[in-house]
Amino acid sequence: MARTQVLAALLTALIAAPLAGCASFTREDFTADQAYRAVPPTAADIRFDAADEAAALAFTNRTRRQLAANGDRRVDILAVSGGGADGAYGAGVMVGWTKAKTRPTFEVVTGVSTGALIAPFAFLGPHWDKTLADAYAGGKASQVLKGRGLGVVFSSSLYSPEHLRGLVETYCTPVMLHEIAQEHAKGRRLLIATTNLDSQQTVVWDMGAIASRGGPDSLKLFRDVLVASAAIPGVFPPVIIPIGDADGHKIDEMHVDGGVTAPFVSIPEGLYFWEAAEGPILRGRIFVLVNGKLDPSFAVVRGRAPTILGRSFDTMMKTTLRAHISANRAFAERNNMDFEIAEVPREAESNSLNFDPESMRRLFKLGEDNAVAGAAWKAPD
């Protein structure tokens, strides 16, 4: 389905929303102070706000110490961006990278939105490539955008979460969590970003720490975070994550697509201006896999609301992506780290909301071929 069709339906739903008279679910009111006090101390082991410099630095230092203790002298970071169906390109790049025999074993892998769905496979390595290819090029993603019909005016989203959650549950299994927990014990980290819509903060989740807790609650939270990170607001419903109690109130948080606040996360926002102290540090490389196109493209925009809305959204996302690329590149240069990006080629036909199986297979094959040929990665201009 084309982006303009989705946005046209979303615009119709927005116009009709005041007529609905009720929402799809209600929540109890609470204050920012209650939300803060409800978070249990143990939550610091599995999540932090990306803008919280102290929390981000504490997490970074713990990870560096454990990696150094395990003999790692270089830290390779892979950040996988959002991009919807264009994630097929990124999935293809990962598989092609394996075939080229140049794919690193990443110490840190992060994901946002569709990148959150790719990240666990990228983290676990080449023996999961076949499953990753099946997820993005096997046709299962084509049912993700399943409409609600007229019920959308009474709902929190345009599309049902049923197929998105089903996709996550199909591939995110206890076996996957067990392997992630094993790698976490070695000091490697798998991080997924969501947006806490109540606090307007990017929340970074340590998925290896969640997996290491074990049990059904761990599996549920792991899946909830993945679904939340991919839940484009208005397109898919938000994910409600219970947190704790404060003043006798049950406190929960509303989480949506991590791309609302960050198109990708290689360096948490709170560390953008941080510089490593003098002395021996671990060398590092940052790879940003962009499931989309960075460069502006010219088009005569027609005077229809969905077209204008779609073009504006696309422009905003590209501008935000380029700003984040610049900030992360500057961080890498200050801290003596290599920095490379991969993106969907300008000439490729792609659409982040086109989950047509043939289109996704073509995009996957393009990413795979480019990686095999050594043409996928480059230093930013």
Task: Give the ranges of each region predicted by the language model.
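Bacterial N-terminal signal peptides that target proteins for export
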Residues: 1-10
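C-terminal motif of bacterial Sec signal peptides marking the signal peptidase cleavage site
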Residues: 18-21
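Catalytic nucleophile serine of serine hydrolases
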Residues: 84, 112-113
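Hydrolases whose catalytic domains are alpha/beta-hydrolase-1, hotdog thioesterase
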Residues: 118-121
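Patatin-like phospholipase
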Residues: 23-107, 123-381
